[in-house]
């Protein structure tokens, strides 16, 4: 979410006296923040206050992201209690009433200890009613319905909202944009569409008015923003291989099980590292960090003894890594669209065949009838499900680069119609609408006062 709005925030901050606070309503959004990443450094530059929900479910405010992370940090014992509670109340064990009840008790105990810890930590409590004083909110309206946003939704109901999709996507083939009937119209939301193909979905499924739909392309693909990001990387972080293939990480999941992820990685290692003598740099997904199953998979398949020799991790921004890479490989990620903005192709290795939830009559399918996800369906990636296909596309990229990437770039331009200066355009539009709303509020106040004086 932050990554999408940062280029616009940068332009807004160039205007006088604009204060922008970052709000984290979900615990997981701060839990998975990687403070050594380029994205964290960028966000720290442009945030004023940081408002976040603590483990006790209370709201706090800190002047910087670093201080918010320090206040949010929980002990190892607390993490284990929270994880156990989650497994018992939401996992497979929850079908047993006694275990689910135990999980709820553990959750209550965990929150109590968090409450005590927060009281002694020196964190500053935040009064949610202060949100009524803000002039606008930058958000993704698609996520407005989430339970964690319920309090914010109530406090911000009269505040103008400006929305961009939190991750790049082919929304026009997503379930959220395919609804049976029109919803109630609403005038409090302005949406900056990345593709004109999103318009009908926003109108029908989210009630957005025509005059509040503004085509913006993809602001984070502005050339000055990409240049700004690349210039931010420190010399220490530049210590990566001179030539490499970028792996865009994704945690193991029901659609990419640990076994399937292992197989894909083995095939990638065999083709890229063994056959073509190339190296791998892995940009991990925020949920892959730590000592979980995903790191164990990388260490097991790629060989921990080979770390720094044939493969390594990097926290650098995807644009920086993408520019340095030969090409990228993903397991399913919106970053593939970012790669096309810098003229780099991505091979998506994902096999959904035989998975009941993803290989059904409702599944998207490619020309060969294979079940696929959105990016493969709309031809923004080179899709593979097996080693032979991977070998063919790697050969094609290495030997016929322009011919291989050209169709992908054509689809990118067709769908999104990107243009330079999008972030400035969006910032100016937001500023204009906020000022207009402030003037209308002043007029309403004047009218109300006059009507009262006549009574």
What are these regions (language model features)?
Residues 417-455:
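C-terminal alpha-helical cap of glycosyltransferases
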Residues 220, 287-342:
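Donor nucleotide-activated moiety binding/catalytic core segment of transferases
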Residues 220-300:
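Conserved catalytic-core segment of nucleotide-activated headgroup transferases in glycan assembly
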Residues 135-136, 190, 244, 279, ...:
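Structural motif
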């Amino acid at each position: 979410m932050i990554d999408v709005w940062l280029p616009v925030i940068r332009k807004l901050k160039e205007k006088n006296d604009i204060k922008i606070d970052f709000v984290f309503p979900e615990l997981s959004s701060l839990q998975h923040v990687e403070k050594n990443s380029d994205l964290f450094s960028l966000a720290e530059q442009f945030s004023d206050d940081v408002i976040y929900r603590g483990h006790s479910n209370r709201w706090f405010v800190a002047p910087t992201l670093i201080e918010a992370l320090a206040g949010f940090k929980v002990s190892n014992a607390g993490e284990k209690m929270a994880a156990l509670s989650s497994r018992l109340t939401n996992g497979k064990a929850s079908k047993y009433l006694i275990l689910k009840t135990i999980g709820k008790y553990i959750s209550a105990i965990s929150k109590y200890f968090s409450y005590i810890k927060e009281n002694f930590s020196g964190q500053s409590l935040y009064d949610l009613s202060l949100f009524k004083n803000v002039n606008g909110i930058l958000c993704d309206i698609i996520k407005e319905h989430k339970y964690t946003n319920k309090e914010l939704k109530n406090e911000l109901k009269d505040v103008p909202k400006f929305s961009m999709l939190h991750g790049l996507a082919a929304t026009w083939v997503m379930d959220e944009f395919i609804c049976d009937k029109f919803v109630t119209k609403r005038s409090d939301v302005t949406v900056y569409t990345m593709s004109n193909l999103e318009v009908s979905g926003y109108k029908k499924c989210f009630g957005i008015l025509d005059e509040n739909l503004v085509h913006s392309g993809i602001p984070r693909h502005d050339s000055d923003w990409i240049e700004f990001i690349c210039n931010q990387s420190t010399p220490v972080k530049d210590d990566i291989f001179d030539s490499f293939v970028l792996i865009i990480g994704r945690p193991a999941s029901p659609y990419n099980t640990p076994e399937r992820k292992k197989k894909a990685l083995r095939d990638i290692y065999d083709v890229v590292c063994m056959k073509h003598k190339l190296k791998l740099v892995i940009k991990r997904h925020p949920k892959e960090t730590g000592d979980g199953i995903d790191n164990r998979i990388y260490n097991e398949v790629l060989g921990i003894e080979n770390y720094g020799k044939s493969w390594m991790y990097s926290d650098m921004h995807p644009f920086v890594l993408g520019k340095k890479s030969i090409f990228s490989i993903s397991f399913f990620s919106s970053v593939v669209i970012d790669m096309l903005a810098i003229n780099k192709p991505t091979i998506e290795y994902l096999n959904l065949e035989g998975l009941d939830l993803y290989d059904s009559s409702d599944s998207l399918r490619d020309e060969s009838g294979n079940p696929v996800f959105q990016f493969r369906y709309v031809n923004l990636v080179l899709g593979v499900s097996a080693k032979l296909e991977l070998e063919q596309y790697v050969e094609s990229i290495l030997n016929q680069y322009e011919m291989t990437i050209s169709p992908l770039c054509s689809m990118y331009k067709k769908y999104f119609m990107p243009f330079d200066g999008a972030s400035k355009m969006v910032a100016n539009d937001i500023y204009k609408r906020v000022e207009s709303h402030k003037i209308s509020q002043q007029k309403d106040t004047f009218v109300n006062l006059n009507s009262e004086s006549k009574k």
